[in-house]
Structure formats: C-alpha cells, structure tokens
Amino acid sequence: MKNLKQPIVAIAVLSIISGSPIRAQAQDDVIFKAMKDEMDRSMKELKIKGHEAPYFISYTVKDKDIVRIAGSFGAIDSKNIERDRDLNVELRVGDYDLDNTRFSDGGLFGMLMGGRMARGENITVDDDYKVLRQSLWSETDDAYKDAIEKLEAKKAFLQQNTVKDRPADFSKEKQVTLVEQPSRVMCDETKWSNTVRQLSAVYKDYPKVDQSIVMFGLDTLNRWFINSEGTKTFSARPEYVLLATASARAEDGYVVCDSEIFVGRSESDFPTVPEMEKRLRAMGDRLTESIKAPLIEDYDGPILFEGEAGGEFFSQTIGQNFGNPIDPLGGGLAAMMGSTNPLKDKFGQRVLPTFISVVDDPAATDYKGTKLFGGMSIDHEGVKPEKLTLIDKGILKTFCSTRTPSRYVKQSNGHSRYGLASTTNLFVTTDATTSKEELYKKLRELGKQEGLKSVLVVRRIQNMFTSVLDPKSILMGMMGSMRKRSGFNLLPASLVYRIDVETGAETIARITPFNGVGLNTLRDIVAVGDDSTAYPILLPTTSQGDALSIVAPSVLVKEMDTQKADKNMEKAPILPNPYFEQKAAK
C-alpha cells in the first residue's frame, strides 16, 4: 500500500464541499454594522470623475471553522484545524441592462463559465469594527476600479460587434431579510483521529489494494450577506464528511477505483464506526475480486446502471448541466468554456424519454427516511429558492438560475452558490416504473436483438475523488465524451457484472472507460426501476458549497459503448508491499 502525497489533493477537493460556523451572533452584530456602514458610504460617495458610480454592491463574509484529518494504513497522514474568514465584494457599474459583468477579455480569471468570479480576500477573524471597515473599504475600492475598466472595454466591444438577443446583465429581485441562528460545533479531534486510524487500517487485510485514503472533514460556515437593494441574510450550517477511496491494479495495468462517502449535518447522521468499517471492507472485497475479472473492451450494447450507479449516471450527465447557460461577450478561454453545456440550445426540446421528469426541490429534507443535504432557505445572492420542474415528461423546461439572466431564464430562481447556478435536491421521477426482474429481462432481450452473448450491469461508478488514485482513466473518459457531439462525461465504472443473455448467469467483469453519453443515448433510455433511492452527491460545480442530494432509480440504457483497451497502462509494482511480505513470512 502506498502512502500517497496525491490524496492531499483530495483533501483540498474535500474543502470545496463544505462550509463552517462562528461565535454567537446577533442580527445587528459588528460584522453587519461594518458592512452596512461601508456600503452606505460607497453608494453615496464612491465615484471617479468621468465615470459612473456603482449602481449595485453586495458584501459576503464567510466565517469558517475547518477540521481535516486524513489517514492511510492505520496512520494519520495529515491533520489541519483552522479558522478563517473571507470577504467577497460584488460591485456593478452601469445599470441592470448593461454593466461590467459577463464580459471576457480573453482571460479565464475575470470570467468563469459565463458568470462572474467573486472577489475574495482573507480578513480578520476578530470582530473588530475598524479593521473590518478597512478591509471592506480596500476591497470595494479595488472592485470599483476593475468594474469601470471592464465596462469601458465591454462598451467598446459592443460598438465593434453586433450581438443579437443580448439578455440583460442583472435581474431585479425582491428585497429579503432572513437571519438564521449561528452554527457552532465543537469537534472531538481525538475521537475522529482514532476513527480515521481504525477505518484506514481496514486495508491492512487487503494485499491487492495498493492505494487507499480515509479523510474526515468538518466544516462549519456562518455567512453574512447584504446588498445595496436592502437584502440582508445570515445563514449557517455545519457539514460532516467522511470519505474513503481505494484502488487496486490488475495484471494488465488497469486500475479499479471505488469510494464510500458519508455525509451528515451532525455526528448522529453518521453510521456507527463498525457499520462504516463493514462498508469499507465490502469495498476491499469488491476491488480484490474485480481485478481478477477479464477486461471487456470496445463494448457496444445495452447497459443497466443499477442502484447507486443509477444515481451517479443521472448526476454526472444531466445533473451537472442544469446551470443556466450564460453566453459571455468577448472571446478567449472563458468564452469557450461558457458554451460547453450539452443542454444548451435544447430548451423546450426532448432530452429524456417522455416517462421521465426531473424536479429540483430546495425545501425537501428527507426521502423515505434518508436525509437530504442540498436544501437551503436562501441562496448566495439573497434570493429565496424555488422548486423547479427542470424536465417535464422528457422536455427540458428550465434551468437553475442566478441573477445573471440568459436567453432562456430571465429571473433568478434562487439557485446561486458562490456565483454559479447549482441544483439542490434533485429528484428523477417517472410514471412508468419497472421491477428488477423486468429490467433484467429487458436487458437480456436487448442483448439478443443485438446478437450479443452477454450484456452489462454496472453497480458502481467512480466519482471525482477517485481521480486522485486513477487520473489516467478519468482523462480517458473525458476524451471519450469529447469525441461525442453534445456529449456528457461519465466516469469509469467501479463494479461491473456480465450477464449471459441465455441463462441470466452473472460473473464479475471489468470494462474500459465509457465513450461518453450523447443526447441520443439519454433519449433512448428504455426503462427505469422502482427502486428510487437518495444518495449524497459531492459535485465540483458546487464550487465552495455544500453536499447535494439526488434521488434516482436504476436505469436501463439501450446502447452505450466503451473504449478500446489502452496497451500502455502502468504495470503493477515489481516488488510486493513489504508489509504483506513480512506478514506472510510470519
């Protein structure tokens, strides 16, 4: 087993998924007072001669308590316990129709996916009014100077270029006041260090598992937000995450990766340590068996994504692409990135079978006794979230939106997380469920129609965290999706079974990465199961946000294909792990 430095990347990624708490705060505390006073002064007095004054300012202060503990093979690899506070300033010059945002001058960092990248700066963690005012003043000054430069460049671009159907740059929304109770969590660092040691030691019993990492994270976020329109919000939430990832390498060099994710708003949401250990051992068993299985390459036929794999299938395809597609003006890398959404230009068209709908419900808290984690009472722009029917009987009806309008959605529906539009609790629903027995029967029938001797059932799919252990397979999957027009990226499978079309007998297998998922593939979904289940989803699109949830059934896809085998895979280590060599010698 390798004690990797790479998993530290995963710790950084895990940091992206949470938030953190602070000390007890009143509605009119020193932070709100400093924000309000500096905003009032800026709206009244901030102006450079010959240029417009700001028409809109918002301030966000996030106070975060962060605990990170990572371990492997029964030992702690890293530990990080910190508190920080940062300030984000959004300042707009011009008016709601035309301002300094949504313009790319060719660089990535001023524009991200057609939206705006929030300005951020670490500030004092002390509730010192004068120091807070100084930080607010300095950041506001920088934001204003940048805004007037961007607006001038944008106006020059519009004079030289014809832009048809340009939407407004900012939507007008209702003033909101919402103040929640502060979040305050005391972490038992010794307890969780021992838990990480115990759980990571599981893989001392699995010689074929050559890489593994167990990470615990507790983020507690308290968030202050005000804007010049009069909106004022305070939101708070803790989030616990325990993530275990592991991999094993087959003799042909292909790596099989898997993970287990546990998410909670409190320790009581977690399973017991013995229950988590049982699941980690099951993962070790799966990996050990999988690398012995034959590799199936260049497969073209039906695939059943069963159970949790069904949730990942929907999450990684349509789920990550419900953000309102924004077309930035200008050019360069940012403009190119802003047009990559496969659902773009499919508004009002069929993207799924007519028996499938997709709903996003920010107010949902549980599904059949399983807690959901994506809900929020207010979004990050101070807009109350709406329940959305994103896809109705297969037809794409709307997108999750922020206050940045698009050609499709003109108003915010309260789905902003750190400036990006995001889902919350996603429900894949159907009025035509199919039993497990019927799904398998249809799968075999489809295989026979294609002249196949066997078909595939995928029961687990990799997620973004397993890329730390197997970056090459992730890259191969991305290349596969790029080769497909309007393709979605689907990460490689972690657990696959081959089903004999005649007898129904199943044997464990491995497959090469998928060649992406095209819109035609989604439209040709044959059936979904009656087994809808809730799963926590940690998406990169949440930027710095929280865990989300998806409720989805198993799904039978009529036709998918996988790549040809890569003949240049890295081989297994020449010498065995010394731990297992010494253990065998005893």
Q: Language-model segments: which ranges?
A:
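Polar low-complexity intrinsically disordered regions enriched in Ser/Thr and small residues
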Residues: 13, 22, 233, 256, ...
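Positively charged n-region of N-terminal signal peptides that target proteins for export
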Residues: 1-6
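Long, low-charge, small-residue-enriched segments that form tightly packed helices used
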Residues: 381-586
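N-terminal, helix-rich and Lys/Arg-enriched segments in bacterial and organellar proteins
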Residues: 8-9, 39
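Active-site bordering "gate/hinge" segments
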Residues: 22-381, 392-395, 515-521, 526-529, ...
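Bacterial N-terminal signal peptides
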Residues: 9-19
